[in-house]
Amino acid sequence: MTANQWQTFFRLCAKILGAGSRHAAQSKSWCAWTTFGSLSESVHYWAAGLPADADLENVGTTDSGTWGQPFLYKDLAHVIIPREFYWEIIEPGRLENGTRQQDISALSNELISAGIEHRLTELVLEIKLY
């Protein structure tokens, strides 16, 4: 995937799935991702809403954006978007939770039109580069 393809992917995600946030309860979209660096060291996956257009720079995502820190596009190894994600709010005297659906089938159709290779299953849409 080129930087331009990643930008197209993330812009289509925001258009189809909605605005992302670091907190699932405030997010219309959700994903998990890892990097080649993480795969070679500790195999860590991060999770947050999908980046907004303002989070996308020429070589990667911005610092302090939806993902909280910068990630180079060339280092992204695996991005997973679930069809459904769980959210909760836990505060003193308040507990709310639920799930949100993500129309990954519609996203898949847009990605096909844009020439972005991906995999769609009943549970997830993913881009896996390893």
Residue ranges and their predicted role:
Residues 1-120, 130:
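Structured alpha/beta or helical-core interaction and ligand-binding surfaces enriched in interleaved
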